[in-house]
Each structure stands twice: as C-alpha cells, then as structure tokens.
C-alpha cells in the first residue's frame, strides 16, 4: 500500500513538473481569480471617478461633462430638488448665473457591487452661502451621497442619487453680526438639515421634509432600497419617495 501511495505521489509530482493537467488547472483557476479581482478593482475605480467627477463638474459649472456621469434615466434627489439629472443641471446652471453659491467636498467611499449594479456611499459636505434673516450666512451640512449605479454597455453611470443629511450648522459670514432664526420655522425640518432647509426655504425653494438623517426610519428605508437594488429588483417609484 505504501509503495502504491509513493508511486502515485511521484506520478503527481512528475505531472506537475512537466506542466501536466494538475498544474495547468491551477494556472487556469489562478488566472480566472486574478481576472475577477482586476475587474472588481477597475469597477471600483470607475465608480469612485464618477463620484469625484460629479462634484468637480457640478461645482465648476461644467454641465456638458456633468451629464457624462449619469445614465439617460438618471434621477437626482436633494433637499431642494427631485427630478431628472437634466433638469437638475439646468436649474443648477440658472441658479449659478443668478448668484446661488453652493460647493461640495468629498470624503471616503464604500462601494458594494453585485454584477452590473452597485451602491456607493461617500462622505460629503455641502456648503451654501446666502442671506438669512438679513444676515449673510454660511450653512455647512455633512452627510453622505448614496448612489445607485448600473453598468450598461460596459459603462458605469448613476441611475439615482440620494443623500443622507447627518448634521448641519449656520454661521454669519461676518462674526460681528448677530443672527436670530424663527424657531417655529426651524423645527419644521429634520435636525440633520434644518439650517440648510431654513436657508433654502428663505430663497424660495420647496424643501423636502423627509430626507434621511444619520439614523432612524427614513435612513433604514434607504438602506433597504440599496439592498433591493443590489438584489436586482426593478427601480420603481418607491426608490424616489
């Protein structure tokens, strides 16, 4: 029995040494694994580039290239706007020309990929400057972009962008000025973006009042939509509610 085992071991080693089937099979498996890892890395790099380009193109007013980060049916949801990415670009462009001052900053990302779908969460802050109760103010809101993405014809793009609004603050640009807010107006809005909403409502924007915060039912519902997207569920109106 021992002799048979030794003989089999020698044959196996010889086959490996000569590049026989066992070695070739391992090489094929390794190549497939390496290929999948490379594809996954390239997908993540492409998605992160989309997230970064969104901010740079929007803040620079580069609307032609801004459109390139979206798929044709791309939809944008923010405190002050819910609609197609084309409408968002047009209204943002018009606002910039009238002096609306909004800039965005990015932090780290986490990206979940399932086949040709992905969900990307990215830490961000929104800074908007405008007069509030007669005082020029800056509002800074921190949160996360929550992007639903798809790969179509080999190209990743945003299908839906939603946001988590985690906390915000308001400060007079001139610290020597004092600011008094109407507490009744302030409490109409969720704590995660109540100062941003106060400012935007004062500018005449209709502000959505159920955007997700750091925690709570609205946040959990959005996480659930992310899981549904990765599970290949169709995107219906519940994703935009």
What are these regions (language model features)?
Residues 37, 41, 79, 136:
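Charge-dense, low-complexity intrinsically disordered segments
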Residues 63-129:
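A solvent-exposed, acidic/Ser-Thr-rich amphipathic alpha-helical stretch
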Residues 127-137, 168-170:
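Short, cysteine-centered beta-strand-loop-beta hairpins and adjacent loop/turn segments enriched
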Residues 104-106, 140-145:
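Short, surface-exposed coil-to-beta transition loops
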Residues 2-3, 7-60, 68, 241:
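Short, low-complexity N-terminal intrinsically disordered segments enriched in polar/charged residues
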Residues 181-241:
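A hydrophobic membrane-anchoring alpha-helix module
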Residues 3, 121, 144-176, 184:
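Short beta-strand edge/turn micro-motifs at domain boundaries
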């Amino acid at each position: 029995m021992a002799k048979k085992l030794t003989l089999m071991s020698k044959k196996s080693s010889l086959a490996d040494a000569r590049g026989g089937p066992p070695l070739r099979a391992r090489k094929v498996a390794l190549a497939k694994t390496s290929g999948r890892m490379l594809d996954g890395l390239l997908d993540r790099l492409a998605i992160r580039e989309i997230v970064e380009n969104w901010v740079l193109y929007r803040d620079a007013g580069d609307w032609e290239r801004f459109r390139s980060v979206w798929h044709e049916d791309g939809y944008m949801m923010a405190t002050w706007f819910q609609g197609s990415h084309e409408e968002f670009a047009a209204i943002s462009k018009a606002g910039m020309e009238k002096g609306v001052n909004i800039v965005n900053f990015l932090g780290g990302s986490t990206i979940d990929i399932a086949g040709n779908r992905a969900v990307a969460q990215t830490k961000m802050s929104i800074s908007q400057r405008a007069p509030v109760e007669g005082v020029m103010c800056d509002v800074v809101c921190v949160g996360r972009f929550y992007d639903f993405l798809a790969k179509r014809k080999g190209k990743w793009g945003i299908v839906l962008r939603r946001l988590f609004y985690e906390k915000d603050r308001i400060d007079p640009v001139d610290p020597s000025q004092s600011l008094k807010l109407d507490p009744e107006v302030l409490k109409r809005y969720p704590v995660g973006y109540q100062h941003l909403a106060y400012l935007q409502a004062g500018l005449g924007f209709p502000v959505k009042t159920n955007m997700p915060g750091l925690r709570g039912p609205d946040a959990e519902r959005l996480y659930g939509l992310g899981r549904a997207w990765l599970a290949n569920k169709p995107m219906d109106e519940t994703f935009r509610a």
